[in-house]
């Protein structure tokens, strides 16, 4: 209602100003301004928020209200008892301990992961080195076998061609010089001499049988050989000494 009355007064004031002359306008304006101040002083601060008037006052009022709310909240926090404060402090301590444990566990896990990665890397390096060494050994062995095969084949073929062309084919092995005189004949001769010395009066049949079955000792053989050599020396025969045996030559 005051707003409507203010608007009506403003309109009536303008009309009155138009009625009065210019000389009498000054005192009237002073009266109008005083009336406006009185009207504005009676209005509440909430109505001034509609227009542009009273912004600074509204901000000051808001700051005062916020400060009062903060003071009230501080007073409310001060109302905690000692038991509640201890309980809150314990909860904070447990939270901090849990946080420290989690950080320690995380750092331990990171260390374990790093060690595992290092061990895996070392194992992989060892495995790679072993594979490289095996490949090097296999390649070297293949190269050596290939070289040996290439060098042996021409030599064998060349040697076979030389033997075939020079000697007219493959011949048997040449016997050694001491195999020219058969060993069986020498054995027969020695056994006959020994048989004559041991059994001089037996017949030829008994001599043949005992010659096949008799096996003298080394001492008997040596004695018989010495006696045979003496008899041969007395008869005028000669013994020719070779590398392995004694050969009897009749004069």
From Swiss-Prot:
A motif (IGT motif) lies at residues 46-52. The keyword Glycoprotein does not apply. Residues 64-105 form a coiled coil. Induction: Negatively regulated by auxin. Keywords: Coiled coil, Growth regulation. InterPro entries: LAZY. GO terms for biological process: positive gravitropism; regulation of growth. Introducing DRO1 into a shallow-rooting rice cultivar enables the resulting line to avoid drought by increasing deep rooting, and to maintain high yield performance under drought conditions. It comes from the Eukaryota. The keyword Coiled coil applies. IR64 cultivar shows shallow rooting in an upland field. Belongs to the LAZY family. Involved in the control of root growth angle. Involved in cell elongation in the root tip that causes asymmetric root growth and downward bending of the root in response to gravity. This is Protein DEEPER ROOTING 1. The gene is DRO1.
